[in-house]
Amino acid sequence: MGLSFTYFDVINAPKFAGLHNYITLLTGDEVFMKYVLPNTVLYAIVVGIGGYILSFLMAWLLAQGTPRIRTVYALAMYTPSMVGQVLITVIWKTIFSGDQTGLANAYLQKFGIIDQPIQWLISSDYFMPIMIFVSLWSSMGIGFLSMLSGILNIDQELYEAAYVDGIKNRAQEIIYITVPSMKPQMLFGAVMAIVNAFNMGWIGVALAGANPTPDYSG
């Protein structure tokens, strides 16, 4: 971080440059302003906020099931966050392979939706949506389990009392009982969502197999 405020090379010692490097980056780098910054903002918003909301909704839905079903599905949803980068890359590059052996192309051609295979991971039109989808798929980690634990630990008598006091549906139940009763877990989930959003940039490079990604799309 400190070096970003200096000018240096392999020969001379760093010299303090103030905000010059940042000004140059924001005003002189066309690629950064046109592609990198908008894509980063879009990715952070969708994966960060979207992953946070999705984690809560999935946790709430699982909490409504039986313990056995809940355990199986929770494990299935948490597993992607535990597998390594190599396995995630192999799985999704197999699905979105650009030839007829790719699962996405194979099924779309089988049902007559497309005539020719789509180059999913080469086309900038598809790359960012795929990157976001894979990131959301692998984002059900500690934050998700924390929310699930928070929901399961809410005193059921609160819900019973709320319905006596006038709560009429599940939406009001979530707004007035569930969320206020699990604020620590919600805060922890928010922190983890932010951390995950900034730690998943490797997914784009892994899917594309190169850096930069196609047309700087991811």
Language-model features: where?
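A structural signal for multi-pass alpha-helical bundles of membrane permease subunits
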Residues: 1-218
